[in-house]
Amino acid sequence: MSNGIVAKRYAVALFKIAKEKHVLEMFEEELRLVQNVYEKNGELHSFLTQPNISKEQKKTFLANVFGSVSESILNTLYILIDNKRIDILSDIANEYVVLANEERNVADATVYSTRLLSEEEKLNIAEAFAKRTGKDAIRVKNVVDEDLLGGIKVRIGNRIYDGSLQGKLARIQRELMKNR
């Protein structure tokens, strides 16, 4: 079975537990924290994937590092260690966020711009795209892209809204070529 399918199953199980306990936000925050630490700490990743280190040592280590997370999240980490699937941790976290966002009618947007946007600009973008997409809210993550000439690009899920100067020039060029 592919890692994506397995990750989705774990995410669905966590989502059901979170929904039952009314802790969608908390689980999301904890999963993002665990994912962040796991992805950014090469030593942790290396330790957890070492075959010569016992499962019990790995679990004890996880309990020490992530002792502040909920029992359900910690137990999931233990199961991943037992099943030698800790490598799909990031996929599980990402799948969980998708499920939680769908439940709350929220979307995550990545906004590419030539400079960092102010909080007010992010709020305006979030409001505009919430209306456009029919979502209750949009969570904006700003990424500076120095390759843009001007304007912004917004990515929500697998959809890109291109309001960049490059995009506008490309559309004008296509129109001119079409009208020849």
Swiss-Prot record:
> Which Pfam families does the record cross-reference, listed alphabetically?
OSCP
Keyword annotations of the record: ATP synthesis, Cell membrane, CF(1), Hydrogen ion transport, Ion transport, Membrane, Transport
Q: Is Ubl conjugation a UniProt keyword of this protein?
A: no
Q: What does this protein do?
A: F(1)F(0) ATP synthase produces ATP from ADP in the presence of a proton or sodium gradient. F-type ATPases consist of two structural domains, F(1) containing the extramembraneous catalytic core and F(0) containing the membrane proton channel, linked together by a central stalk and a peripheral stalk. During catalysis, ATP synthesis in the catalytic domain of F(1) is coupled via a rotary mechanism of the central stalk subunits to proton translocation. This protein is part of the stalk that links CF(0) to CF(1). It either transmits conformational changes from CF(0) to CF(1) or is implicated in proton conduction.
* Membrane-topology annotation of the record: Peripheral membrane protein
What are the GO cellular component annotations?
A: plasma membrane; proton-transporting ATP synthase complex
Q: Which NCBIfam families would you find in this protein's record?
A: ATP_synt_delta (TIGR01145), PRK05758.2-2 (NF004402), PRK05758.2-4 (NF004403)
Q: Which SUPFAM superfamilies match?
A: N-terminal domain of the delta subunit of the F1F0-ATP synthase
Q: How does it assemble?
A: F-type ATPases have 2 components, F(1) - the catalytic core - and F(0) - the membrane proton channel. F(1) has five subunits: alpha(3), beta(3), gamma(1), delta(1), epsilon(1). F(0) has three main subunits: a(1), b(2) and c(10-14). The alpha and beta chains form an alternating ring which encloses part of the gamma chain. F(1) is attached to F(0) by a central stalk formed by the gamma and epsilon chains, while a peripheral stalk is formed by the delta and b chains.
Subcellular location, principal: membrane
Q: Does the keyword Phosphoprotein apply?
A: no
Q: Which organism is it from?
A: Bacillus anthracis
Its annotated compartments are: Cell membrane
Name under which the protein is recorded: ATP synthase subunit delta
Q: Which InterPro entries match?
A: ATP_synth_OSCP/delta_N_sf (IPR026015), ATPase_OSCP/d_CS (IPR020781), ATPase_OSCP/dsu (IPR000711)
Protein family according to the UniProt entry: Belongs to the ATPase delta chain family.
Q: At the top level of its lineage, which domain of life is listed?
A: Bacteria
- GO molecular function list: proton-transporting ATP synthase activity, rotational mechanism
